[in-house]
């Protein structure tokens, strides 16, 4: 089964790292948002004997009984895959065959990866540029030269759209005073929205203490993300 997974990883553009996979240990896979992780998991679910669990958002049950389940102990005799493994407390102590995650979403230490993919097909070039400015290794894999899905503005003068995501307590309170229902970045981990507005009272993303929360907040949108800081100057 490992060889089948490696073949599929290679076709999706995943790259083998220098960390050697030892037989009997979990195969560890890390991928950025939009790299095709969910597509991979759903294709693996079609294989006999494979069970997929997740520490993130799981699927609703279906008639076939084959779906991405809420994280639980591995099934005896099955080939067990754990998605978003850092969110599941027992990932180290249980016998998983594959551990997979977008590890950039987590502050906690994660396992060393055997395969990685830093190429996103979902996020646009400007979103990628914003993430790279704060130190994330992510690459735009699309073909569209302009990113109409990402806009920057000023926190105190701009209109909020879609799901508001706050990066600090003060920004959260500002959104509430406007009669909105903001979510903290942590609350949105594993979720997606058509449109988001990410807000912070800091003058730049570099000032946000929890850098992994910046990554989470800027990768929740399917179509459009508005980023509002306390100091906005259009990029040259």
UniProtKB/Swiss-Prot annotation:
| Residue ranges constituting the (+)RNA virus helicase C-terminal domain according to the UniProt record | 118-236
> Which keywords does this chain's UniProt record carry?
Host cytoplasm, Host-virus interaction, Inhibition of host innate immune response by virus, RNA-binding, Suppressor of RNA silencing, Transport, Viral immunoevasion, Viral movement protein
* Entry GO terms, CC: host cell cytoplasm
Q: Where in the cell is it found?
A: Host cytoplasm
Domain named (+)RNA virus helicase ATP-binding: residues: 1-117
A GO biological process of this protein is: transport of virus in host, cell to cell
A matching Pfam family = Viral_helicase1
Top-rank taxon? Viruses
What this protein is reported to do is described as: Transports viral genome to neighboring plant cells directly through plasmosdesmata, without any budding. The movement protein allows efficient cell to cell propagation, by bypassing the host cell wall barrier. Increases plasmodesma size exclusion limit. Acts as a suppressor of RNA-mediated gene silencing, also known as post-transcriptional gene silencing (PTGS), a mechanism of plant viral defense that limits the accumulation of viral RNAs.
Q: What else is known?
A: TGBp1, TGBp2 and TGBp3 seem to act together for cell-to-cell propagation. TGBp1 is the main movement protein that physically cross the plasmodesma with the viral genome. TGBp2 and TGBp3 would facilitate TGBp1 function.
Oligomeric and partner information: Homodimer and homooligomer. Interacts with capsid protein. Interacts with host AGO1; this interaction targets the host protein for degradation, thereby suppressing the antiviral RNA silencing.
Q: Which family does it belong to?
A: Belongs to the Tymovirales TGBp1 protein family.
Q: What is this protein called?
A: Movement and silencing protein TGBp1
Its taxonomic placement starts with: Viruses, Riboviria, Orthornavirae, Kitrinoviricota, Alsuviricetes
């Amino acid at each position: 089964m490992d060889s089948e997974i490696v073949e599929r990883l290679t076709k999706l553009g995943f790259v083998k790292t220098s960390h050697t996979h030892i037989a009997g240990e979990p195969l560890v896979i890390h991928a950025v948002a939009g790299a095709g992780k969910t597509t991979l998991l759903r294709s693996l679910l079609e294989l006999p004997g494979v069970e997929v669990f997740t520490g993130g958002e799981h699927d609703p049950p279906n008639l076939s009984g084959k779906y991405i389940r809420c994280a639980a102990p591995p099934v005896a005799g099955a080939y067990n895959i754990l998605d978003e493994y850092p969110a599941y407390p027992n990932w180290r102590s249980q016998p998983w065959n594959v551990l997979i995650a977008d590890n950039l979403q987590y502050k906690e230490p994660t396992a060393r990866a055997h395969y990685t993919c830093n190429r996103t097909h979902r996020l646009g070039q400007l979103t990628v540029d914003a993430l790279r400015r704060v130190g994330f290794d992510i690459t735009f894999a699309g073909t569209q030269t302009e990113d109409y899905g990402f806009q920057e503005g000023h926190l105190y003068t701009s209109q909020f759209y879609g799901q508001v995501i706050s990066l600090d307590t003060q920004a959260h309170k500002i959104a509430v005073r406007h009669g909105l229902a903001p979510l903290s970045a942590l609350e949105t981990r594993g979720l997606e929205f058509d449109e988001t507005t990410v807000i912070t009272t800091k003058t730049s993303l570099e000032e946000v203490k929890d850098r992994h929360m910046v990554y989470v907040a800027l990768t929740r949108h399917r179509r459009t993300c508005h980023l509002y800081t306390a100091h906005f100057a259009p990029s040259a």
